[in-house]
Amino acid sequence: MRAKKSLVIAAVALPLAAALVVTLALTSKHGSTEPRAFCWGQLSRRDLGQLSTGKGGGYSAEDEPRAYYSGYQKRKFPLCNISQGGAWMAEISVRPSLHNSPWGSDGLDRRAVYESAAPMPHGITGWTGIPHKPQWPSAQLLLPEACREPFRTGDSDVQLRVILRNRQEERWSDTSTRERMTHIATKVGDHLTRKYKCGDENWQKKGQGATPTSKFEHVDPANVCRLRDLKVFTEPEAAEQVRQRTAGTIEDTWSCVTVLDKRLQEQTSTDTGATLAAFTTTRNPHHLTEFKEAHGSSTSGKGFTARIVRCGSREYLLNAKYPVPDKSDAGKFGEKNLLDGETLYADFERAFKQRAQCAG
């Protein structure tokens, strides 16, 4: 009887010991039972470390779905909130498109966004933004059109967003922040397209590194936006009051924005009251198709002119944006010191074709 009782105790003890070994194996060096994978099992502790401005672990994540209305129907979309040490650190979400792509049709008349936006590398319809305080850095990309059906978004694209809930500049550089956000967005994007069988983009491979971006710099009045012979000002002296910022690659997806220097020095939030002329190019097929369906080969409006331009075998969407005369600082400065909108666009197209070595 005693021997039988010993066998029972041993049988119970062995699974408990095994469970203890597993628990210890999963325990981090900080002594916690922190998970090894987060956000639908796609992100590692190392991945989350790329989003953090703190040190150590203590990560947790909740990946409950969030409800949005798609048409008249209430739908649930993936959402993951990430915390470190109990403090909210980042959010990864999927939802119907916000129609806010800086290089898409919905961005034709927007200028201020280019103070912080930069396109993701070639082959990805997405962008990163690191705006002025108090806003947060973000990365956003559009999933392939085939993903509309499984997500049931109708005619709207499916948009993936990564938003960081803390400032990065004290630990990470601008370029590093964009690279790290792109890494997370493309990793989750690849997972979603595989899971829902709506694309095989291999974004993570395409998204290594970041597109070139510059800090705000002085303007050469004879070569604005680093484009040879692009002139924006009625008098060269006006350039002394202006700074410019470029992002991306002009032969692919690119932008340049000019801003009143005094407003930059005030460190105000991004707003159209400070933004002067902005110029963009893209050969992204998604944006070209979207533009053609909405506008044909060209369109213009209050403060912008946009056209499809052929360069050899490639097509580009070019857009020149400019302030209209009003009581804002940009409106008053532009009326006095900037060339008219028609001339700005014509000079920009000419300078682009020269830079891209377009035939004809």
Which residues does each predicted region cover?
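Detector for methionine-enriched segments
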Residues: 1, 89, 120, 141-142, ...
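Intrinsically disordered, low-complexity segments enriched in small/polar residues
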Residues: 2-3, 69, 152
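Hydrophobic membrane-insertion alpha-helices, especially the h-region
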Residues: 2-27
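Generic detector of bulky aromatic hydrophobic side chains
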Residues: 6-11, 51, 177-182
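Extracytoplasmic low-complexity, Pro/Thr/Ser/Ala/Gly-rich segments
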Residues: 25-107, 200-260, 335-339, 345-360
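Short, structured coil/loop segments at alpha-helix boundaries
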Residues: 45, 173-177, 284-285
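Short, solvent-exposed recognition patches
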Residues: 57-133, 236-326
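A short, solvent-exposed beta-edge/loop patch
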Residues: 126-196, 292-360
